[in-house]
UniProtKB/Swiss-Prot annotation:
Catalyzed reactions per annotation: RNA(n) + a ribonucleoside 5'-triphosphate = RNA(n+1) + diphosphate
CDD domains in the record: RNA_pol_B_RPB2 (cd00653)
Subunit record text: In plastids the minimal PEP RNA polymerase catalytic core is composed of four subunits: alpha, beta, beta', and beta''. When a (nuclear-encoded) sigma factor is associated with the core the holoenzyme is formed, which can initiate transcription.
Protein name: DNA-directed RNA polymerase subunit beta
Organism: Oenothera elata subsp. hookeri (Hooker's evening primrose)
Its job: DNA-dependent RNA polymerase catalyzes the transcription of DNA into RNA using the four ribonucleoside triphosphates as substrates.
Any one GO molecular function term: ribonucleoside binding
InterPro entries linked to this entry: DNA-dir_RNA_pol_bsu_ext_1_sf, DNA-dir_RNA_pol_su2, DNA-dir_RNAP_su2_dom, DNA-dir_RNAP_su2_hyb_sf, RNA_pol_bsu_bac, RNA_pol_bsu_CS, RNA_pol_Rpb2_2, RNA_pol_Rpb2_2_sf
NCBIfam families tied to this protein: PRK00405.1
Enzyme Commission identifier(s): 2.7.7.6
BP GO terms, sorted: DNA-templated transcription
Length: 1072
């Protein structure tokens, strides 16, 4: 963010800036730090050869391919890392120095993402507990407070110090094992005299020192043996040795005692120590100071720590994650070099630096990181907003973090320190609620991984405030004015009493007592929440839903700007990278659908445009030129709009005419009634591109062939194939047709293996024995559309493990239909229930039929009244041909500011259009509507307006499914579950009750037997249906009951049923 000299203006930072800064920090600092840790490697036998890297000579090479080519050819967009290495012979002091290639590092593109194997991937920032010491108090089973101090290492390991009733201090190395703090300090190198000199309460340490502990801490070896015995839970008497010390160092001290730079700073600040920053390991002095503070806590001195406060958290950014992986790759490279040197000397070969180093460790480490690490995710590209929001996520999950199953409510809850740093609204729904957050707009990651937020410093001598960034540990000591104190007139501010924040409490103070103030109304919201107009009138749960649903909106074929917005639409569109921006000024000399040629500074620049590309959510990405030929443009001007942008502004939905009223029950329970105009005029029509892929392999019988000559297939299924056997571009394909013809070789069976009648049939019909089987790529159900692209990616090299890949892209045009999901920007969502003819829709007093009918009962109970303000203001803006950009919390200027704005605009629209029904004082914002079927007016006036409605990606074409036949589970013999497996619908316990309530016994029996798991009965249904007659009723038990009987038998329980005769009451036993 940039502040100017006027002291009141600032610019919003780039939304991708955090990703860029993290990657630059890794390239500038992280590489150097890890390379400097690479040790000098000596030969293990005679130590005559020494290998080392020269850190200052490393350099990265510009990639040989472009981003588009990397995506097209499924390659990684990376840079080669070179560094000078030296091989020194100690006997002769000769050194051989060479520049070697040690691997590829994936680069970050202009969107803040990386391209790995042709896929856009992004690294999520992680929130971890900051290393240091934290004191807390818990009640034991007797209701007595137990004080503990937890030391967290840089690796995430924990060492707990606790004090018992007798004021004895223990170090707990595991849940069951604990050891005296005197033994731990002695094992770390201190003797009893040093311990007593460095503590504030020596008498307490001496009070619980018995004879055994005196003997143990008398020597370091005895203390280490005692500690090893407790830590490793070994019996007997272990013998002190170097291997024992090495094992203890690796398993305990390295994991639980390495604090790192951040941990050392936190430890020094919390315990008032002055240990140098380069001492990153836990020292005996730290342990003793922590014990002193724990004793003080026991007697009421000191304060407990809030572990959920952001000052006790740190951000593990993309720089830290990439640096950790680079360090891991160098450790692997070290072991490779060491083995290679030993092998060369063993075989009496002369090694060179070039022969010792391989690029495999670095390349494979980063490939596995981007492909398998939980914090490396595939970039969600549903719409432009989704792309920028994805890179600003914060996760408590991942390695070293929390788990969704064990995280408590307190960890998920909003903390006051989130103000201006983490959005209190934007989070996931479901099991990850509160664990996946989003950065606030102005937040940045500072040194040490702390989240910083900007404030204006209020100075008594000058009206111009300085803009300062504060970490969570600093701003709690200042009086911070809340966001509603951003009045324009400073004179008004000085007279009023304003709400403020101080030490996580909310106070009311005079203006002259305030130290800091917020800089922006959106400062504490994320991007998604900042795009909701009138958000202050909505319940937070509905605002959360809206933030998530805006990321699910599909780009429409005809985008439209929102009438009522917040002003951040242009910034979101710009930073998403979906628009084409002029890199320099010049003149447009040629424009087309696929490129724009710009002339300036004596040369020409060709700017390629994105045409009908597929996102990973099957939505379309397309750029449309917005500048005519011959126009002079400036640097930074928009040349082409993206799939969901208009004029450089984000455009995710449509402004449609909406009425809030019931209509024959078709909008019951959030259902939505729409007009056929939305279908016929392509208002909510969207394009979706599906990808179908096939690979050719070399089998044991020979290579697979791509051909258009497929035997035993009907000709109309092959009509769209070209001479190579691949579907032609521009073809219209239906479900079941062949996209790629492929034959896989198979071993021909001998003639004698066939049955006699089959051999006779082959001889009569002249059928030859086939040596290959058909394995064509067929279009699945629901995939009909137009073929827009075919890619045949040839394999590089002759390896059979690197097959050829053929990809077919099919474009589908989807109008809105019954079953699709639509939503507003206030959490008001619904499913299309019916599409009415436009003449049957309710119409306004000027004859215009409405486009959508929402249920009015969905507003008061959900407390998202912001949709009513947007609805009415959008109607006024449509009549006045205006667009509004509303900042949130406008009541900071005056009471009822939102209502006054809406009513004033409606009144002006009523005057300018000479339509008094637009604003009627008796029921402002409402109007009398007429029934389109009868022409009669409705009894009550209805709220009408033009809100911004989105079409979401949850579409009925992707979800509707029916099963006529399919596979059955092997164990239960019931139909499989899921659309992808052609599964069936489960008739569960409550469904059976419902059918029983209606008395449909025969229907219920069919569902539980023929259509489910009665094997014998369902086999007889097909023949009976073909030949006619009644379907036989099943007599024995279905397979699921038989399975239950077998499972009970495995528990030694026998279950049988008996039939009792009515005549002689004899029991006839029958096996289950």
């Amino acid at each position: 963010m940039l502040g100017d000299g006027n002291g009141g203006m600032c610019t919003i930072p780039g939304f991708n800036q955090i990703q860029f800064e993290g990657f630059c920090r890794f390239i500038d600092q992280g590489l150097t730090e890890e390379l400097s840790k690479f040790p000098k490697i000596e030969d293990d036998t005679d130590q005559e050869i020494e290998f080392q890297l020269f850190v200052e000579t490393y350099h990265l090479v510009e990639p040989l391919i472009k981003e588009r080519d990397a995506v097209y050819e499924l390659l990684t967009y990376s840079s080669e890392l070179y560094i000078s290495a030296g091989l020194i012979w100690k006997s002769s002091r000769d050194m051989q120095k060479q520049t070697i290639f040690i691997g590829n590092i994936p680069l970050m593109n202009s969107l803040g993402t990386s391209i790995v194997n042709g896929i856009y991937r992004i690294v999520i920032n992680q929130i971890l507990q900051s290393p240091g010491i934290y004191y807390r108090s818990e009640l034991d089973h007797n209701g007595i407070s137990v004080y503990t101090g937890t030391i967290i290492s840089d690796w995430g390991g924990r060492l707990e110090l606790e004090i018992d009733r007798k004021a004895r201090i223990w170090a707990r190395v595991s849940r069951k094992q604990k050891i005296s703090i005197l033994v731990l300090s002695s094992a770390m190198g201190s003797n009893l005299r040093e311990i007593l000199e460095n503590v504030c309460y020596p008498e307490m340490f001496l009070s619980f020192l018995n004879e055994k502990e005196k003997k143990t801490i008398g020597s370091k070896e005895n203390a280490i043996l005692e500690f090893y015995q407790q830590f490793s839970c070994v019996g007997g008497d272990p013998v002190f040795s170097e291997s024992l010390c090495k094992e203890l160092h690796t398993k305990f001290f390295q994991q639980r005692c390495e604090l790192g730079r951040i941990g050392r700073q936190n430890m020094n600040r919390r315990l008032n120590l002055d240990i140098p920053q380069h001492n990153t390991f836990l020292l005996p002095r730290d342990i003793l100071a922590a014990a002193d503070h724990l004793i003080g806590m026991k007697f009421g001195m000191g304060t407990l720590d809030d572990t959920n406060h952001l000052k006790n958290k740190r951000i593990r950014s993309v720089a830290d994650l990439l640096q950790d992986q680079f360090g891991l790759a160098l450790v692997r490279l070290e072991s490779v070099v060491r083995r290679t040197i030993c092998g060369a000397i063993r075989h009496k070969l002369i090694p060179t630096p070039h022969n010792l180093v391989t690029s495999t460790p670095l390349t494979t480490t980063y490939e596995s990181f981007f492909g398998l690490h939980p914090l490396s995710q595939v970039l969600d590209r549903t719409n432009p907003l989704t792309q920028i929001v994805h890179g600003r996520k914060l996760s408590y999950l991942g390695p070293g973090g929390l788990t969704a199953r064990t995280a408590s409510f307190r960890m998920r809850d909003i903390h006051p320190s989130y103000y201006g740093r983490i959005c209190p609204i934007d989070t996931s729904e479901g099991i990850n609620v509160g664990l996946i957050g989003s950065l606030a707009i102005h937040a940045r990651i500072g040194r040490g991984g702390s989240l910083e937020s900007p404030f204006y410093e209020i100075s008594e001598r000058s009206n111009k405030g300085r803009m300062l960034y504060f970490s969570p540990s600093r701003d709690e000591y200042y009086m911070v004015a809340a966001g509603n104190s951003l009045a324009l007139n400073r004179g008004i501010q000085e007279e009023q009493v304003v709400p403020a924040r101080y030490r996580q409490e909310f106070l009311t103070l005079a203006w002259d007592q305030v130290h800091l103030r917020s800089i922006f109304p959106f400062q504490y919201f994320s991007i998604g929440a900042s795009l909701i107009p009138f958000i202050e009138h909505n319940d937070a749960n509905r605002a959360l839903m809206s933030s998530n649903m805006q990321r699910q909106a599909v780009p429409l074929s005809q985008s439209e700007r929102c009438i009522v917005g917040t002003g951040l639409e242009r910034q979101a569109s710009l930073d998403s990278g979906v628009t084409a921006i002029a890199e320099r000024e010049g003149k447009i000399i040629y424009t087309n659908s696929d490129k724009i040629i710009l002339s300036g500074s004596g040369d020409t620049l060709s700017i390629p445009l994105v045409m009908y590309q597929r996102s990973n959510k099957n939505t379309w990405m397309h750029q449309k030129p917005q500048v005519p030929r011959g126009k002079c443009i400036k640097k930074g001007q928009i040349l082409a709009d993206g799939a969901a942008t208009v004029g450089g502004e984000l455009a995710l939905g449509k402004n449609v005419l909406v009425a809030y009223m019931p209509w024959e029950g078709y909008n019951f329970e959030d259902a939505v009634l729409i007009s056929e105009r939305l279908v016929y005029e392509d208002i909510y029509t969207s394009f979706h591109i599906r990808k179908y892929e096939m690979q050719t392999h070399v089998t044991s019988q020979g290579p697979e062939r791509i051909t258009n000559e497929i035997p035993h297939l009907e000709a109309h299924l092959l009509r769209n194939l070209d001479k190579n056997g691949i579907v032609m571009m521009g073809s219209w394909v239906e479900a079941g047709e062949i996209l790629v013809g492929k034959l896989t070789p198979q071993m021909a069976e001998e003639e004698s293996s066939y049955a006699p009648e089959e051999r006779l049939l082959r001889a009569i019909l002249g059928i030859q024995i086939s040596t290959s089987k058909e394995t064509c790529l067929k279009l699945p159900i629901g995939g009909r559309g137009r073929v827009i692209d075919v890619r045949w990616i040839q394999k590089r090299g002759g390896s059979s493990y690197n097959p050829e890949t053929i990809r077919v892209y099919i474009l589908q045009k989807r109008e809105i239909k019954v079953g699709d999901k639509v939503a507003g920007r206030h959490g008001n969502k619904g499913i299309i229930s019916k599409i009415l003819p436009r003449q049957d829709m309710p119409y306004l007093q000027d004859g215009r039929p409405v486009d959508m009918v929402f249920n009015p009962l969905g507003v008061p109970s959900r407390m998202n009244v912001g949709q009513i303000f947007e609805c009415s203001l959008g109607f006024a803006g449509d009549l006045l041909e205006r667009h509004y950009r509303i900042a949130p919390f406008d009541e900071r200027y005056e009471q009822e500011a939102s209502r006054k704005l809406v009513f004033s605009e409606l009144y002006e629209a009523s005057k300018q259009t000479a339509n008094p029904w637009v604003f009627e004082p008796e029921y402002p914002g409402k109007s009398r509507l007429f029934d389109g079927r009868t022409g009669d007016p409705f009894e009550q006036p209805v709220i009408i307006g033009k809100p911004y409605i989105l079409k979401l990606i949850h579409q009925v074409d992707d979800k509707i499914h029916g099963r006529s036949s399919g596979h059955y589970a092997r164990v239960t013999q019931q139909p499989l579950r899921g659309r992808a497996k052609q599964g069936g619908q489960r008739v569960g316990e409550m469904e059976v009750w419902a059918l029983e309530g209606f008395g449909v016994a025969h229907l219920l029996q069919e569902m539980l037997t023929y259509k489910s798991d009665h094997i014998r009965a369902r086999q007889g249904v097909l023949g009976t249906t073909i030949l006619g007659g009644t379907i036989p009723k099943p007599e024995d038990a279905p397979e699921s009951f038989r399975l239950l009987v077998r499972e009970l038998r495995s528990l030694a329980l026998e279950l049988n049923h008996f039939l009792v005769s009515e005549k002689n009451f004899q029991i006839n036993r029958k096996e289950a």
